[in-house]
């Protein structure tokens, strides 16, 4: 078969040979130093590459340039451009639901910044600390949150985080740019007010802004001067604090109502306190009859393993119950002494004194009695169940040693100022007698109480050389370190994230609150 000959641009000779045509000696010699592109064995790689090689010559004819431009343009048209991948956007329905959730949170007086942080934590499987109002609102839209958490791939959750981020940023910007209130506030312009209400952020800004009121004397006199103007930031902080206080008050009201109904039903409060304490500290479920009673007053007797103990109805009821039993201490002490059962010479000198479990030794039983009787000293607790006076000092020493392994580290803990603690919702009982912060396990907290070791327990551990960081340590829960030691003596479990917590790693979690 004869070969196919042709002339390329600038009369450059191209020759394509048939497969069965032999290679002549001249072709072999001429192609030994030739480029592989012009080899009779291979077809050109591409017109574009061939054109680039042709550019190396010193002189190119007009035909060559036109041929190169034509082939380059055809190659570009043959390859469609790759469009950049656009990120998936939330559907309008998801945005509407997210905006509605934020509206509900604002109306309820929730701390949007805290909700945003805790929402991120629950999506990252970290410890959370929602208020009851926040929890109920989110649970309506994420019904599986209490068992499965919230997936990081949830479109609604991510849209809610984005909306919260925008609203919080808008609030911070407004606070930073807000002027001092003038003595005679001017009437807002109607057009600007309407335009600000058109957007979601404008509506939230209008809801979160404090209401400005003036007395009748200020309304009638335009020359009156307010010599004590208040910052908008301070007014908004007060409004948010009042809303959070109302939420806590509502939670306390529900707990008090449940406790009142249990009392009217004739429930043995000492037995109930023992069962709740055993469940909280040792995860032993309450008896069936007490579980039914708790459910009848609206309290779920179960705490899922995924949930934190903080702000849990069972824990709130236990705190209120311990306070009520402690108030009966004087009456109980003045009552007659009697044995608890036949053959038992134990003297009931404690307000709350349940029966000893079969597997409890003297130290474990003594620590449990300390938890149930916050006002009692170790010596008095031991005297209540150790009948042999000569055996009491050893038991007292053993209990002190167990508790001291935790409490002895109090002075070596990293510190956090009282002002920084107040930014984390700490309220000293000496400064807020009507609404103090209660210990996770009982009484109200105060830095002026010499019998307390007030600490903030973080949800995440950090190096002991690093100061407190909300990003690294997460939120703080304030408590008495002595009461925490009693809890850890029975069950060395972190009350907020269920991880192990003992004397070896508590320094990474705890911060000592110090006066300013």
From Swiss-Prot:
One of its GO terms (cellular component) is extracellular region. Its main location: secreted. Residues 183-196, 212-224 have a biased composition (Low complexity). Induction: Transcriptionally induced by HrpL. Residues 31-41 have a biased composition (Polar residues). It comes from the Bacteria. Transmembrane segments: none annotated. Keywords: Hypersensitive response elicitation, Secreted, Virulence. It is found in: Secreted. Residues 81-90 have a biased composition (Pro residues). Residues 1-93, 175-259 are annotated as: Disordered. GO terms for biological process: symbiont-mediated perturbation of host programmed cell death. Residues 16-30 have a biased composition (Basic and acidic residues). Belongs to the HopAB family. Effector protein that plays different roles depending on the species and plant cultivars that interact with the pathogen. Acts as a virulence determinant by enhancing the development of disease symptoms and bacterial growth. Acts as an avirulence factor by eliciting hypersensitive response (HR) and plant resistance. This is Effector protein hopAB1.
